[in-house]
Every structure is written in structure tokens, then in C-alpha cells.
């Protein structure tokens, strides 16, 4: 679940 942290940083 790596997208849990960069999805909000984008």
C-alpha cells in the first residue's frame, strides 16, 4: 500500500 502516502503528496 505505497499509494497511501504519495497520493496525497501529489
Curated annotation (Swiss-Prot):
Keyword terms: Cell wall, Secreted
GO cellular component: extracellular region
Subcellular location: Secreted, Cell wall
Keyword Secreted: yes
Top-rank taxon: Eukaryota
Protein's name in the database: 62 kDa cell wall protein
